[in-house]
From Swiss-Prot:
Gene3D superfamilies, sorted: alpha/beta hydrolase
The keyword Hydrolase is assigned to this record: yes
Gene Ontology terms for molecular function: serine-type carboxypeptidase activity
Keywords: Carboxypeptidase, Glycoprotein, Hydrolase, Protease, Signal, Zymogen
EC number assigned by the record: 3.4.16.-
Protein name (database record): Probable serine carboxypeptidase CPVL
Family per record: Belongs to the peptidase S10 family.
Residues bearing glycans: 81, 132, 307, 346
Length: 476
């Protein structure tokens, strides 16, 4: 069945036409207050599950056609903590090709506090929002071949919300527990997908979320009656191991010409102090140093990086500012007809600031042990855009070289492979290092928001990885 499906995928590809405001700031986070007009009522699906009215809840979650959207999808809220009334918002798109067999892929945005609606509308969902608030079809949507589940995570992100401050996550264990509750409910509403292969994916700060939820699934599957069919994970430009990344910032920024010798020395000194605090588990102090030096998330003044480079964008070192069209989606989500269709009503679209404040101490902590566990047991894809600054390819590779997993020695000796999509291509798509089920990919011409800049390369990469078709070019 998979072989047949892959032939369809390749045929489809052959027929197709050929802010970053920072890791933690406002590129993904445009606050959308409740709009004027009839936005309908929020749909909470947990009561339907508990009452045994699953089919009714499923029918209500169907997204009605609006503004040109005609692809079947489902959306609503899943309650993950009744005590605090904590709810996660999801939007699910069954694959356009053979959804009954296609893998289910969970997408988590970074931040912390960035909505996965950014991934949906800016990166790889079926539609792109235009400047006049209409939709156009995306050329290479991941929803063609994969059933994509977008969740606003953690609680307090995007449309997800809680009624109590105790409902906010303060560490990755909290994040994983809420996600796990949502996933179990999701597969109750859509039981026909529970045996499909399941992958957890995400980018940036989701380099923590992805290993966290994968670790919890791995731990609970042997002892729970309801099991999630986890097959692997994919992390793009992931902030999984802050210490190894922070230590390389100064030299990297110097080598790409954004810092001079004097600035590099100051940057290195600050990074060294940050790492010292990390090693002493002074998490808050480490966060403050990094925030003032580079991120500028919770400070009132521009960061040192912004002052000396004059640039706010460190998702792509060829651009100084963020593309305007990456912000259209937030305005689109404020339209009453959109809110009514996706069943969020007048709920505020949160900017993520509160989420980040509660996760400040988590920011500089590593999830390397969990990532190692997943690398030892599942398929793993770690990818980077060539032009990224905040989680540069070289910094990710440095982190990987320091990991101790079953393939670590072989990985250190492995040769990098040139990856082209088609044999006739004059351009190289990227570079791959593969050891067993572990794949490290660097995408040429890509930035932190990879599918936005390189949609075809991102589409080809994720399908090669999930469907296990290797990295040899297609004939065509």
């Amino acid at each position: 069945m998979v072989g047949t499906m892959w032939k369809v995928i390749v045929s489809l590809v052959l027929l197709m036409p050929g802010s970053c405001d920072g890791l933690f700031r406002s590129l993904y986070r445009s606050v959308s207050m409740p709009p004027k007009g009839d936005s309908g009522q929020p749909l909470f699906l947990t009561p339907y599950i508990e009452a045994g009215k699953i089919q009714k809840g499923r029918e209500l979650s169907l997204v009605s056609p609006f503004l040109g959207l005609n692809m079947r999808s489902y959306a609503g809220f899943l309650t993950v903590n009744k005590t605090y009334n904590s709810n996660l918002f999801f939007w699910f798109f069954p694959a356009q090709i053979q959804p009954e067999d296609a893998p289910v892929v969970l997408w988590l945005q970074g931040g912390p506090g960035f909505s996965s609606m950014f991934g949906l509308f800016v990166e790889h969902g079926p539609y792109v929002v235009t400047s006049n608030m209409t939709l156009r079809d995306r050329d290479f949507p991941w929803t063609t071949t994969l059933s994509m589940l977008y969740i606003d995570n953690p609680v307090g992100t995007g449309f997800s919300f809680t009624d109590d401050t105790h409902g906010y996550a303060v560490n990755e264990d909290d994040v994983a527990q809420d996600l796990y509750s949502a996933l179990i409910q999701f597969f109750q509403i859509f039981p026909e997908y529970k045996n499909n292969d399941f992958y957890v994916t995400g980018e940036s700060y989701a380099g923590k979320y992805v290993p966290a939820i994968a670790h919890l699934i791995h731990s609970l599957n042997p002892v729970r009656e309801v099991k999630i069919n986890l097959k692997g994970i994919a992390i793009g430009d992931g902030y999984s191991d802050p210490e190894s990344i922070i230590g390389g910032y100064a030299e990297f920024l110097y080598q790409i010409g954004l810092l001079d010798e004097k600035q590099k020395k100051y940057f290195q000194k600050q990074c060294h102090e940050c790492i010292e605090h990390i090693r002493k588990q002074n998490w808050f102090q480490a966060f403050e140093i990094l925030d003032k030096l580079l991120d500028g998330d919770l400070t009132s003044d521009p960061s040192y990086f912004q002052n000396v480079t004059g640039c706010s964008n460190y998702c792509n070192f060829l651009r100084c500012t963020e593309p305007e069209d990456q912000l259209y989606y937030a305005k689109f989500l404020s339209l009453p007809e959109v809110r009514q269709a996706i069943h969020v009503g007048n709920r505020t679209f949160n900017d993520g600031t509160t989420v980040e404040k509660y996760l400040r101490e988590d920011t500089v902590q590593s999830v390397k042990p969990w990532l190692t566990e997943i690398m030892n047991n599942y398929k793993v894809l770690i990818y980077n855009g060539q032009l990224d600054i905040i989680v540069a390819a070289a910094l990710t590779e440095h982190s990987l070289m320091g990991m101790d997993w079953k393939g670590s020695q072989e990985y250190k000796k492995a040769e990098k492979k040139v990856w082209k999509i088609f044999k006739s291509d004059s351009e190289v798509a990227g570079y791959v290092r593969q050891v067993g089920d572990f794949h490290q990919v660097i995408i040429r011409g890509g930035g932190h928001i990879l599918p936005y800049i390189q949609p075809l390369r991102a589409f080809d990469m994720i399908n090669r990885f999930i469907y296990g078709k290797g990295w040899d070019p297609y004939v065509g």
